[in-house]
Amino acid sequence: MAVWHSANGKVYLPPSTPVARVQSTDEYIQRTNIYYHAFSDRLLTVGHPYFNVYNINGDKLEVPKVSGNQHRVFRLKLPDPNRFALPDMSVYNPDKERLVWACRGLEIGRGQPLGVRSTGHPYFNKVKDTENSNAYITFSKDDRQDTSFDPKQIQMFIVGCTPCIGEHWDKAVPCAENDQQTGLCPPIELKNTYIQDGDMADIGFGNMNFKALQDSRSDVSLDIVNETCKYPDFLKMQNDIYGDACFFYARREQCYARHFFVRGGKTGDDIPRAQIDNGTYKNQFYIPGADGQAQKTIGNSMYFPTVSGSLVSSDAQLFNRPFWLQRAQGHNNGILWANQMFITVVDNTRNTNFSISVYNQAGALKDVADYNADQFREYQRHVEEYEISLILQLCKVPLKAQVLAQINAMNSSLLEDWQLGFVPTPDNPIQDTYRYIDSLATRCPDKNPPKEKEDPYKGLHFWDVDLTERLSLDLDQYSLGRKFLFQAGLQQTTVNGTKAVSYKGSNRGTKRKRKN
């Protein structure tokens, strides 16, 4: 039976002003058949696995912190293709086009053997085991113990042309009407920051600012107790309208709870008891113990596990293998704006810490009669080894109004680098130039000298890798280049005895129809 109802729903109208549509780079970028191979040197770093080591006065850093649980953020600087002396200058028209790089493949090489490290704290806040306790746990004034464990296992890398965006939880500013009393838990908020080289990754205790939110300095291991652990904000980067921060990523994490402990100290949030809501919660969560029993004083409910990364195997490695970029997750399909590339890496499967012992007494080691631990100093060092290889494709950007409008809205400095602005003719072609401009005999120099281009990531710490002179057209001379030629079905051609800059696919003969 059909019954008529009056319109009781809302009417949604389109916006009064049109919303600008962001085009994918595939819609206006013209790709050429010119490919380059780029590779870095062997990148090595050595340091202490837990903290920075300073001199006796504390004013000079002697050994930096190098941990397998840190992020490594490589900032690869590429040459400007518009200033290349190309073998074939007819590839593009500089009056109507500009050249950019596109990433087609990469391989992150890692040296050193697989290994598991142990991290911990000499004053770790844990009170016995809560999984298999045979007696009721009692607390004292200081129950901290010297405890160590292995971290969560993580392999991950993120590739983009801007730094990777990370997220972590930090202390928030309380509202003005809420008087923050001493000893109360502060409000927390989620913050987004760039992941820099050396930032700690999550090792099983969460992505949090431990320096600001753990005053006891004993709830986590030494390598993160004074740090902020960050985790990539994949949700934010996946919804980026331009897709520059993350073209694609690979991730593998695993852990399991190995030990179960309880924290020492006074519980901040009490379990609801009879005094709540006029006795409504009486005996709702627990029944008190009898007098004379150890259970009379209820224990602490701050339970936590120590995780373990479990087995480290070469069967599940993300590194030392090629990755090919056919389609990125965002609108930027691998175009390296500003001729730079950011690779954020975390890998703690090669997490061995070297133990180095040094005899600290005068005389030869062979003269030692018996072992004395006080005569030896123990040191720890961690080493890392990287090598990065890229396959770059030369692409053309047409200088059309619609394309330039989107690029200007995305990053106006790109147009300045391309020198597209109108340069007026100087009023006077002859300018005055003083030789001794800083002497007392000449006038004062200009107080407002022309400013150099400011780095948009000034103040951020990255591992800079200069690849401006590390490009080659001879792809078949390199391991990653040969893999790319094979998987893409390309073969290198020769013109006039020199290597050509183009590749063509293999031609197959047409099959003849069989006569019946």
UniProtKB/Swiss-Prot annotation:
It is found in: Virion; Host nucleus. One of its GO terms (cellular component) is host cell nucleus. It holds the Pfam family Late_protein_L1. InterPro entries: Capsid_L1_Papillomavir, Capsid_L1_sf_Papillomavir, dsDNA_vir_gr_I_capsid. The keyword rRNA-binding does not apply. Its main location: virion. GO terms for biological process: endocytosis involved in viral entry into host cell; virion attachment to host cell. The keyword RNA-binding does not apply. This is Major capsid protein L1.
